[in-house]
């Protein structure tokens, strides 16, 4: 497949993959396609993991919303909530991704936040040295605005313990990505 590739990484020593799949963020999600007013084909991948330590199964969904299409982001959020309900049912959920949109983009954000919990808000401990998660490779920390938070970790039936935005520079010269890594320690 040409274009975007998204993966879910996990430790095989702790987790066993039980199921996996993907769908496109479009009106025809089962077919490779570009949706609504999107500039690129975008997708969501998912996997069902079994935690060998806790004997619990849960689902991880990973996505990347379009950076141009406002309607595409709104409809992608609506589609993901629908797919999560269909695929995962009542199971614990983790949804991660670059949503290319701030929480102030209320319709897109609330479609997700009304069903899932944003760990940036709900986690017991938060280490957020910057307001945003997008750095453009060379932005100074002082340049960050709250509306530059475009990367998210949403959960359902988990408790967010420690949410962090990691803003380390490589050799103090540049960032390894145009986005800061976002992480959250969770528990059942």
PLM regions: where:
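Structured beta-strand-rich core segments of catalytic domains in phosphoester-bond hydrolases
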Residues: 1-57, 165
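Alpha-helical elements of Rossmann-like donor-binding domains used by nucleotide-donor carbohydrate transfer enzymes
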Residues: 4, 46, 75-83, 107
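Conserved hydrophobic/aromatic beta-strand scaffold that supports enzyme active sites
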Residues: 6-8, 44-48, 62, 152-153, ...
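Short beta-strand segments enriched in hydrophobic/aromatic residues
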Residues: 51, 64-65, 186-188
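Hydrophobic, aromatic-enriched interface-forming segments
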Residues: 62-67, 71-76, 80
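Active-site metal-binding loops of divalent metal-dependent hydrolases
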Residues: 63-65, 98-99, 180
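Metal-dependent phosphoester-hydrolase catalytic domains
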Residues: 71, 75, 85-93, 101-188
């Amino acid at each position: 497949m040409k274009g975007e590739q998204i993966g879910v990484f996990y430790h095989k020593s702790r987790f066993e993959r039980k199921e996996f799949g993907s769908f496109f963020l479009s009106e025809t999600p089962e077919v490779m396609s570009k949706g609504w007013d999107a500039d690129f084909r975008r997708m969501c991948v998912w996997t069902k993991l079994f935690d060998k330590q806790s004997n619990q199964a849960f689902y991880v969904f990973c996505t990347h919303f379009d950076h141009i299409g406002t309607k595409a982001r709104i409809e992608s959020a609506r589609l993901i909530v629908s797919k999560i309900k269909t695929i995962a049912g009542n199971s614990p959920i983790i949804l991660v991704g670059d949503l290319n949109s701030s929480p102030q983009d209320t319709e897109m954000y609330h479609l997700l936040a009304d069903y899932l919990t944003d760990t940036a808000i709900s986690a017991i401990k938060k280490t957020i040295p910057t307001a945003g998660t997008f750095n453009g490779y060379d932005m100074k920390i002082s340049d960050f605005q709250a509306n530059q938070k475009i990367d998210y970790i949403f959960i359902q039936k988990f408790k967010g313990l420690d949410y962090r935005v990691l803003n380390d520079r490589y050799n103090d010269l540049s960032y390894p990505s145009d986005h800061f890594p976002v992480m959250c320690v969770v528990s059942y």
